[in-house]
Swiss-Prot record:
Associates with the 50S ribosomal subunit. GTPase that plays an essential role in the late steps of ribosome biogenesis. This is GTPase Der. Residues 4-167, 175-351 form the EngA-type G domain. It comes from Ligilactobacillus salivarius (strain UCC118). The keyword Repeat applies.
Amino acid sequence: MANPVVAIVGRPNVGKSTIFNRLAGERISIVEDTPGVTRDRIYARTEWLGHPFNLIDTGGIDIGDEPFLTQITEQAEIAIEEADVIIFVVSVKEGVTDADEKVARILYRTDKPVVLAVNKVDNPELRADIYDFYSLGFGEPIPVAGTHGIGTGDLLDKIIKEFPKDATNEEDDSIKFSFIGRPNVGKSSLVNAILGENRVIVSNIEGTTRDAIDTRFETEDGTKYTMIDTAGIRKKGKVYENTEKYSVLRAMRAIDRSDVVCVVLNAEEGIREQDKHVAGYAHEAGRAIVIVVNKWDTLKKDNKTMSDFENLIRQEFQYLSYAPIVFVSAKTKQRLDKLPELIKRVNDNHEQRISSAVLNDVVMDAIAHNPTPTDNGKRLRIYYATQVAIKPPTFVIFVNDPELMHFSYERFLENQIREAFDFEGTPIHIIERRRK
């Protein structure tokens, strides 16, 4: 199951971004940013009381130079389409406005839960004014002050109560993968070419997200795959359909539901900032990753073209040094037959478990060749290591003092583990814990 999505909507100047930053910052944990991922985020991966979810500020979705009421409408429609829970933000300072009522009328169309947050209630005298907002028809308003963090705990408690229950627990042994990338990199062509080349049986199944249709197929060796649909709002002609931020949001949904993410680049156009945004999100989410360079047939090539492009990728995506790169053409089918096999291999690595005995042999051998660092005369001591999770493989190393583990030595240990075991295509996480 993908993490639930919570969208923040409301007219301008009610404090949506302040509430977004508050919920995504001090009161709840947020997965650390990877350099080069994104600058002005409209989404955050967060959690509250052990419930992970994705938070979206629809106000950050740029819909061009349209009248602001039109923008509100379209942002609310995005929330209705994408979210599991909607936070409707209003301001106690202005009371109920015509624009608030317009947003409310749009939200009446959905059967998704709407939590009404009355912002800017920064002193007790204003609390009596929140009852005016009952007229909007969304039940009890929750008073908050985004700037000061007042009421955010109550708001979060209400939100997680509204999360959908897992609809199914049935086992699915297929490998779930998706093609992500900015518009015009050739994702649709790749999907069609892969299905045309490799399918033995194909069925369309209801996706867990809105009107998405996932496609299952099986290759001749019996491996089952589910291709995750990345389609979002299917309203042709909408200005926001191809905006950068909306396509990032669409990719985020697919990444959360995938085991393996194929980051698609356009060989003709090289690497753009948005390529880094979506790849960085997949990395932060701990997914297995394959970098797919599409439209390779369109380039004039010499004997250095491929190595030069690979070097560029390694330079621009330094945090994806573990990800294999494949150069393909959806049009000519060049190397497409290799892709399902590569997806399976990185998925196997993503699920790989290493026995503690073998792992500790590697770690102790690494220490013997490169002794642990010291700080102010105190040496880091590593007692033992064990794998505690898969997808991604996660290792806990028990030490005398976690503060003594320098990031460069942790990187050294990661490299030694990667050399000893095949973890191509998957991030690995290392956690230091003090031995009790």
